[in-house]
């Protein structure tokens, strides 16, 4: 149990150097491995260039739309009541929605079969923008599970 009183102040995060956007900065931080931020930045910006070449659209807009499509609305949490564990659907807080969307896009990008990470990331962004892709499938699976367990929504806390 947490012994902390009150709310924790959210950390201040600087915008990224190219677009001055905090969401991109957060995405790059999540993409980073072993503290190599410059590598993560180059992978991300190269992925945006790949998107611009392949689609001819604004890559920043494609990224934003892909992230918006990957964000979950609801999720399920386990709640134990009388020796039985129920999957209780709950609405996701905005900060957690962003974190989950970023996490899923990166996770399923890494699992793809393209040659380089920039191509994997670009392909996942383009698929997520269209409403397909593994990150969107994950979101839909969780939504379906929440719909199936709607009967237990009165067990919220």
Swiss-Prot record:
Keywords: Ribonucleoprotein, Ribosomal protein, RNA-binding, rRNA-binding, tRNA-binding. The keyword DNA-binding does not apply. CDD domains: uS7_Bacteria. One of its GO terms (cellular component) is small ribosomal subunit. GO terms for molecular function: rRNA binding; structural constituent of ribosome; tRNA binding. Part of the 30S ribosomal subunit. Contacts proteins S9 and S11. NCBIfam families: rpsG_bact (TIGR01029). This is Small ribosomal subunit protein uS7. It comes from Leptospira biflexa serovar Patoc (strain Patoc 1 / ATCC 23582 / Paris). The gene is rpsG.
